[in-house]
Amino acid sequence: MKFITVAAALFASTSLAVPTNPNHGGSACVPNPHHGGSSTKSGPGGNPTGGNPTGSNTNTGPGGNPTGSNTSSSPGTRTTGGSTSSNPGPKPTSSNTRSGPATTTTGTKTGSNTSSGPATTSTGNPGPGGEFHCPRGLYSNLQCCATDVLGVVDLDCASPPTTPTSGDNFNAICAAVGKQAKCCVLPVAGQAALCQNPIGGNPPGGNPPGGNPPGGNPPGGNPPGGNPPGGPVCPSGLYSNAQCCATDVLGVADLNCDTPSKTPTSGADFTAICAASGQQAKCCVIPVAGQALLCENPTGGNPPGGNPPGGNPPGGNPPGGNPPGGNPPGGNPPGGNPTSSAPGSNPTNPPGGPVCPPGLYSNAQCCAVDVLGLADLDCDTPSQTPTSSADFRSICAADGQAAKCCVIPVAGQALLCQDPLGGNPPGGNPPGSSNPPGGSNPPGGSNPPGGSNPPGGNPPGGNPPGGNHVCPSGLYSNAQCCDVNVLGVANLNCAPPSTKPTSGKNFESICAAIGKGSMCCVVPLLGQAILCQRAII
């Protein structure tokens, strides 16, 4: 009787042991394409709950040592590798079973989830010989990206040089060129917007999602227009200005842009003219010398991304009432008269002395945050007038900031959005208060950018356009519901409210109903940044 009691105790201690599986010890957030699922028995006679099919591993007889990745054990069996389970009680009825005396078995999980034991197969993420895919839909484009901003914006992106066969292979391909593997919305050469990490290994739900193969059709379909009414290369309306641009940021802000050296006669000719100078053909909102904002691909051919964001150019006329190519908000057309008065002083005498170049980037600013060398945030006018570049740098450094020469001397923002009227936005005073950002006088001098009046006409705080009472008149007059806010600066995925707001609270509730935030914007489209360059050394 004692012998039976001791044997029963030994049997219980052996069958209830749960071994540690080194192959499944990582974080669930880290893609691991080697593991396509696990076969874990939940009770007597149960079927596996993971991704591997039942009956995939078969043992040949008592005492055998299977080498497959998934093993099951009857009472008295302990396993030390692979995916394991223990089933005290009746023998399961599936083919993943064996019976026999207490035995120790070992197994090794292979990269392709195919074990070496007899009659063993399993399925999971694509292995060697297959192709790795990003999820179907919006994030279907495989990209290797150099810079990730807050997990929202990925820059300096390109397609992988070879087709990945798995999540780990995708990571390795990108890591070899010093980049990160991403699944992106826009397959734009040199950059991509709205990226997420690629799915590999055991994504939520077990099975790897399908998707479009690399180099497939970009989202959006056909290019805008066909024969645009405004000319042969750019559509009429907001995006009517043909420009050759060197740098594309997010498919939205195009930098280092110039007017084509000659008038293009077609979309192909436009592309060729710009390519001759190492630039890209773009149709832009504001043709500012040295840079341009809010560009799209020209008419003709299949540009990356297809249609411009949101389909037709929003609004028709830009903020301020004048159409593109005419007078921009504030009076003189940007870049039209390079000797016109710049914010703060004459461009031939940059503000504060010889510290910033004349023209567009003439505003000396001390900035706290630099994003990718493009967007400078939390900026203020230097506490005293710099006398030299070294003095400029030291003045800013004393406040823990960096010396910058900026286009728009606006404190602490880049997309040019502000909170709507009504309530107290972060920072205390609501938009449209008597003092502009940065103090009693706007940065750059006693007059705001563009001359004595702020861009767009009346200063914020006047009567809102159309009497909607949610956004100030002038520069920030466009009510928008925006999805993503980056640093309180860049607002992405914006659209006009579905109904006309009657108050600030109503505006907020309209946007909140679709999971967005209420904003008052300069340009009712995706966002761009302040556009700063380094001070003259």
UniProtKB/Swiss-Prot annotation:
Annotated glycosylation sites: 70, 113
Compartments, as annotated in UniProt: Secreted, Cell wall; Secreted
Signal peptide: 1-17
Membrane-crossing segments per the record: none
Region Hydrophobin 1: start-end pairs: 63-199
Disulfide feature: 134-183, 144-174, 145-157, 184-195, 234-283, 244-274, 245-257, 284-295, 356-405, 366-396, 367-379, 406-417, 471-520, 481-511, 482-494, 521-532
Sorted UniProt keywords: Cell wall, Disulfide bond, Glycoprotein, Repeat, Secreted, Signal
Repeat is among the record's keywords: yes
A Gene Ontology cellular-component term: extracellular region
One Pfam short name: Hydrophobin_2
Record bears the keyword Signal: yes
SUPFAM superfamilies: Hydrophobin II, HfbII
Region spans: Hydrophobin 2: 200-299
Main location: secreted
Region (Hydrophobin 3): 300-421
InterPro entries per record: Cerato-ulmin_hydrophobin, Hydrophobin_sf
Family (UniProt): Belongs to the cerato-ulmin hydrophobin family.
Function comment: Aerial growth, conidiation, and dispersal of filamentous fungi in the environment rely upon a capability of their secreting small amphipathic proteins called hydrophobins (HPBs) with low sequence identity. Class I can self-assemble into an outermost layer of rodlet bundles on aerial cell surfaces, conferring cellular hydrophobicity that supports fungal growth, development and dispersal; whereas Class II form highly ordered films at water-air interfaces through intermolecular interactions but contribute nothing to the rodlet structure.
Subunit structure: Homotetramer. Further self-assembles to form highly ordered films at water-air interfaces through intermolecular interactions.
Domain remark text: Contains four hydrophobin units with the same cysteine pattern CX9-CCX11-CX16-CX8-CCX10-C, which is a little different from HYD1 and HYD2, but corresponds to the consensus defined for the fungal class II hydrophobins.
Protein name per the record: Quadr-hydrophobin
The gene coding this protein: QHYD
